[in-house]
């Protein structure tokens, strides 16, 4: 399993001959190295409905005939836009041709905001995402606060790499993320969701220096690790 980071919360997984993107916020993302028009993808996994996570999903899914795996309400909302979706919910898992996906809890919001009409559409509960393929497991926490059931996520899953938000303000900050890393018991922890906007500026290297009993890895946009 090859895993690459592409700024903000964008993670690409290459496994079993398939390409999977998590939270593909590309257009308007100052920290990504990817251009939507150049991306080839087989499946898109979404943690929640905010614009900086749904991003280019509709365009990418239509262009590549990719399936979008998302919480039920968000999947339904996107299906109305002509996207091929697979709805799931927290606690549920499903075997796809690239591997197994399971949704976990995340403490955040989830909505689609229409600035022009000044409306907010509820898109279900936010989620974290577990992907297991080639006997390796990745945990993408989505946008979330620290919560004690992260201990359970760590106990139930042998996590090889965890992507944890550290930006603060909208998610947990670095101090809480250090505790989250301890609880999820991942072998490797990669910080995400930081420095995209001024309000979430953080030093990822200071964060990884504080980690214990795991390997902290700062990935620049386009860099990857192989599990």
Swiss-Prot record:
Domain of life: Bacteria
Keywords, ordered alphabetically: Hydrolase
Any single Pfam family the record assigns to this protein: Lactamase_B_2
Gene3D superfamilies: Ribonuclease Z/Hydroxyacylglutathione hydrolase-like (3.60.15.10)
Keyword Nucleotidyltransferase: no
One MF annotation (Gene Ontology) recorded for this entry: hydrolase activity
HAMAP family referenced in this protein's UniProt entry, alphabetically: UPF0173 (MF_00457)
Family: Belongs to the UPF0173 family.
Full protein name: UPF0173 metal-dependent hydrolase BT9727_4343
Species of the source: Bacillus thuringiensis subsp. konkukian (strain 97-27)
């Amino acid at each position: 399993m090859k895993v690459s980071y592409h700024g903000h919360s964008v993670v690409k997984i290459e496994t079993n001959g398939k390409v999977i993107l998590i939270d593909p916020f590309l257009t308007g993302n100052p920290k990504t190295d990817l251009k939507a028009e150049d991306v080839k993808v087989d499946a898109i996994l979404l943690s929640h409905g905010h614009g900086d996570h749904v991003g280019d999903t509709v365009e990418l899914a239509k262009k590549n005939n990719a399936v979008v795996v998302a919480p039920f309400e968000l999947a339904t909302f996107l299906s109305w836009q002509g996207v091929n979706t697979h709805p799931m919910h927290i606690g549920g898992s499903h075997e796809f041709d690239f591997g197994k996906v399971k949704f976990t809890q995340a403490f955040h919001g989830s909505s689609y905001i229409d600035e022009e009409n000044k409306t907010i559409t509820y898109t279900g509960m936010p989620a974290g995402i577990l992907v297991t393929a080639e006997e390796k497991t990745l945990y993408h926490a989505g946008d979330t606060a620290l919560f004690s059931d992260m201990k359970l996520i760590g106990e139930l899953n042998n996590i090889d790499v965890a992507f944890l938000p550290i930006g603060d303000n909208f998610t947990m900050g670095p101090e809480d993320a250090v505790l989250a890393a301890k609880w999820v018991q991942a072998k490797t922890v990669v910080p995400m969701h930081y420095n995209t906007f001024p309000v979430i500026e953080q030093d990822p290297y200071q964060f990884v220096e504080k980690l214990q009993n795991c390997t902290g890895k700062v990935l620049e946009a386009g860099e990857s690790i192989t599990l």
